[in-house]
Amino acid sequence: MEIMVEKNDLDFFVNKRIFITGHTGFKGSWLTYLLDRNKAIIKGYSLSPISKPSLFSNLKFSDQFTSVISDINDFEKLRNEIVNFKPDIIFHLAAQPIVLESYENPKNTFDTNFRGTLNLLEI
């Protein structure tokens, strides 16, 4: 198996303040875990995991990690969390990714995937 990332590349994230939206999803959980293991200071912002048990709830995180369970469409809460945390880096992974759900609830999908991103960019 080919090594995709050298350890020295991950040293960049040591003690960086990182804000991750969608940290309870599949990709967000792994990103949070990887950065946490590399001593980043992380605040995650996401809805509760949709599956039980979830990958997110099965992973173990350090005391450097804080999880906020909230909706990316709540502009004031999102703004307050980002402003108070003062991140060096923001990873935006929050989304409504389920295609069938997008057909059944297109407004929610639009709000989350478009307006949620717009909320983040407005801050």
Where are the model-predicted features located?
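N-terminal Rossmann-like NAD(P)+-binding domain of SDR-like oxidoreductases, especially those catalyzing
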Residues: 1-123
